Amino acid sequence: MAARRALGGLILLRNIMPVNQIEITSCGKRLLVPCAEIEGRTVIVTGRCVKIASIRDAIVAEGELVKNPGTFVPALKRSGLKADVLAFFQRPPDVTPKFKHHFEWDNYAAVDCANFDAWWEKLPQEARKNTRRSAKRGVTVKVVSFDDALAREIHQLCDESPMRQGKPFWHYGKDFETVKREHSTYLERSEFIGAYFENRLIGFIKVVYVDRIAFIFHILAFNAHYDKRPLNALITETVKICSQRGVKYLVYDKYVYGNKKESTLVEFKRRNGFEQIDFPAYYIPLTWKGKIFVALRLYRGAVGLLPAPVLKLGLKLRDRFYRARRKPAETKEV
């Protein structure tokens, strides 16, 4: 009997695949997380109280992320990964829900690149003026290769200000090698478009091509050159390049973030011709804890659960907090 139990234990161990660890970047920080290979995908687990299993670097993974949940979920459970929920999504343009599992509509901010001229004509007059103004003020925009010279210019750009969009900027204060490494991912599928003034980089966009979509990974410009509107010129050139390459969509992260419907970033995207495209995001519970998590829709996070007025107040308080922190630092510098 003891031998049979021992043999059963060995069989059980053989059925569980080894769990490894892999490094990921989250909010500008490098973390080690558990991972396993499942049906050709690297699955990682993140979270503390509730463990979320997801496809590593899902945004740049080509093809369907999960072809068949009916086989993927059992394989995940056998993998040895301790997860409460499996989360994945369907990438546009295929947005008709395929699976009979719990899902919610997520969204992208996207430009339809099929016809550059049609996109240009639909832009608000002010956006077209800003692009022309950029050229008149001496800004040139071109595709550039990623090398040490470009990485140094990007490093200088990252160090212009510790704050971006009212909050601490992730890349500020990092050393050159770190900035170079973090901007050199997926180079075989990437393109860098730079905006130059008097032969100096004043802004850039990095896009990564995934199937028929181009994702904006980085977009940044010197605040000191805002009057030259480099970002408008960069977006226009990027849409033109995508149209020439036969790319369906240029995507700039989300259009709206949960109940945060209004912000300067949302307004910037709207003025530059980005529109909201919805797609299904699936959340499949794997444990009793996962069932509660999904039933209460806690995956939405604070931005998706708190009412808009509360979020607006919270953002105002956050801005005041960061401004108060900056004043002592500025006083010391003076």
Predicted regions and their residues:
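N-terminal accessory interaction module
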Residues: 31-89
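N-terminal amphipathic/hydrophobic targeting modules at extreme N-termini
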Residues: 2-3, 7-9
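Aromatic (often tryptophan-rich) hydrophobic motifs at membrane interfaces
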Residues: 74, 185-294
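Active-site/acyl-donor-binding loops of N-acyltransferases
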Residues: 18-51, 55, 99-118, 248-334
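A conserved beta-strand-loop-helix scaffold within acyl/acetyltransferase catalytic domains
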Residues: 13-53, 94-96, 120-226
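Acyl-donor-binding surface of acyltransferase catalytic domains
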Residues: 12, 65-147
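Amphipathic, soluble alpha/beta structural segments
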Residues: 155-184, 246-247, 258, 262-271, ...
